[in-house]
Design a protein with these regions (language model features):
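FIC/Doc superfamily catalytic core
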Residues: 1-250
Length: 250
């Protein structure tokens, strides 16, 4: 199984190296209906402008975003502890978990400054997110990496030599695509996780970039806790990713 994963990665990586190749995906009627329904809800939220007026609500939601995104990655801090860390209070917890919160808060606070089409900004975001936590902070991994469930390999990341070109192609597609932002964000999220470009922090950065793409469409997405939904439906989230892996489509 391990060898088969690598063979499939080599084949798919070679295919995606072609210039201007779009990620493989189909837009079904169900997807179009969901885009329409979400668009209707987004319009109502935008009209209220609640996030722009209520700074307390924005901060509370940002804390929920950080708590959920890190909890998905097995960070042990509670929502209350995350709040205390962000507010500069002393928390008795593993230093690694505290540092993850501090790093995540720093980059989410700079979300509006990031260019969603910039690989340089992607690397900067990763550098901040993983500062003092991993050796290859702020750069693409140089070694093979996979995602494991216990001892079971559930996803093998793209071979390191393919990563720069694949990420470049993905960002070119993101910049030039005329698809709806909801579709672009979802496709990017999956393709990014499939490539698995970093030693660690791929999930956190993937969710960050998903929010970034949507925030360039509607500003309030910068404070909307999408990560909390991912945490709540984590099982379904991974099932969807695995189904895309099997189908070979975003």
């Amino acid at each position: 199984t391990y060898t088969l994963f690598w063979k499939l990665q080599i084949i798919r990586g070679a295919i995606l190296m072609k210039k201007e190749l779009s990620p493989p995906f189909k837009i079904t009627n169900d997807i179009l209906n969901l885009v329409y329904e979400i668009g209707e809800l987004v319009g109502k939220i935008s009209a209220e402008k609640e996030f722009e007026k209520n700074l307390t609500l924005r901060k509370e939601n940002r804390i929920k975003i950080i708590y959920s995104s890190l909890a998905i990655e097995q960070n042990t801090l509670t929502l209350e502890q995350v709040t205390d860390v962000i507010n500069g209070k002393r928390v008795l917890a593993p230093l690694k978990d505290i540092k993850e919160v501090q790093n995540a808060y720093e980059i989410y606070e700079r979300l509006e400054e990031l260019n969603e089409n910039s690989i340089e900004d992607l690397l900067l975001a990763h550098k901040i997110m993983t500062s003092e936590l991993i050796k290859e902070s702020g750069r693409f991994r140089s070694k093979n990496a996979g995602v494991y469930q216990g001892e079971k390999l559930i996803h093998m990341g793209t071979l390191p030599e393919y990563i720069p070109e694949l990420i470049n192609n993905l960002f070119l597609w993101l910049k030039n695509s005329k698809e709806h932002p909801l579709i672009k964000a979802a496709v990017f999220h999956y393709e990014f996780e499939f490539i698995h470009p970093f030693q660690d922090g791929n999930g956190r950065i993937g969710r960050l970039w998903h929010s970034l793409i949507l925030s360039k469409w509607k500003k309030f997405f910068a404070w909307l806790p999408i990560e909390s939904l991912v945490q709540k439906y984590q099982k379904e989230y991974y099932i969807a990713i695995n189904n895309s892996n099997k189908d070979g489509e975003s």
